[in-house]
């Protein structure tokens, strides 16, 4: 290589490296997106295996009666109040939550571990998750204790002793059907009589969380909504990347067992390895106990414009494991979580900008209205730094056609950067819009990422 050419090439590389470092440095005003290169663990995405595949399910278990239909209907209104997550499950409790583990049918594996299965059921449930307390008589639980969870679907999820806390119950993943099968796996040096297990409550879903109707039934969004794949930008790398950063959130309140849906966005950062930073709304996750129950659903979209259930993306992936709250500001409705498990391959770490959004900007929103497959809405920023419903520093967006709904809460307000990529600028609080609303009500409000970036910038760089 010619000496001058070589020096020029080195200079270009140095400048590129410097730019990359500047974007990753604390206090940087923006950052481009990036494709995920890590692989989620099979245990957290439903690809675990039973330790004893041929074991029988013990008759002993916990069984819950179905809740009154009017209670289920009352819990999930068609138009929840702005600033509230969409409720999709109700809590059921029992007066006899304990299971005597010594009464189960135990079978040893070839390596000496002890395994047993038992059912947790709720009459008529389309989907189900359970709160489980498992502890030794001394209180602490060995890390090598395993729990496997399965329902009517093919997924088998896994949790270990380190996932369970003596301070609060562990909420299982949401499974399909009215019966959750639990396999308990104990190390060779631990006996069933050494443990106490109880199931104080379950969260009951009257409709399937994963097979929600696409134009009728639970999860069906309004008629004005636009499938994400129908957007004119669909098929471009920038837009498809932005959709791959968005996930449906499902979480449960330990106080009453109610389960809820919001939308969130995975954010890029300069850490190595990357941290799983996840942006949503403060009104979705109120405390750490709730954050610990979070599971995210990725790639939940149709592959054809206005497709029915048969066109659901076959790559839909459920990620369990919960999250930790890094930042929460109820007044501004901002929330930054860190997922405890690595998202699946193919997700995108969304770029962002901490520069205040300009009035008149074109805004984009990719979201899960009523828990439906991903939808796309586009609108114009008509006011910044406003107060609405007691919340401050919000950005107002006016919608000409498609709007947002319950379940869309927390979804990212995006703008397009000079290079054509998308940048997150805030998260959805809510507002008066609905399909068919008059022009005066076709607007909603988003939090402002730039207004809290000084508080959270340390999480985006080493």
UniProtKB/Swiss-Prot annotation:
Key words of the record: Autocatalytic cleavage, Disulfide bond, Hydrolase, Protease, Secreted, Serine protease, Signal, Virulence, Zymogen
Active site: 283 (charge relay system), 333 (charge relay system), 409 (charge relay system)
Enzyme's top EC category: hydrolase
GO molecular function annotation: serine-type peptidase activity
Propeptide: 25-211
Gene Ontology cellular component list: extracellular space
Subcellular localization: Secreted
Reported impact of residue 411 to A: No loss of activity
Chief site of localization: secreted
Catalytic activity: Preferential cleavage: Lys-|-Xaa, including Lys-|-Pro
UniProt entry tagged with the keyword Signal: yes
UniProt family annotation: Belongs to the peptidase S1 family.
PANTHER family: LYSYL ENDOPEPTIDASE (PTHR36234:SF5)
Record's protein name: Lysyl endopeptidase
Species in which this protein is naturally found: Pseudomonas aeruginosa (strain ATCC 15692 / DSM 22644 / CIP 104116 / JCM 14847 / LMG 12228 / 1C / PRS 101 / PAO1)
Gene label: prpL
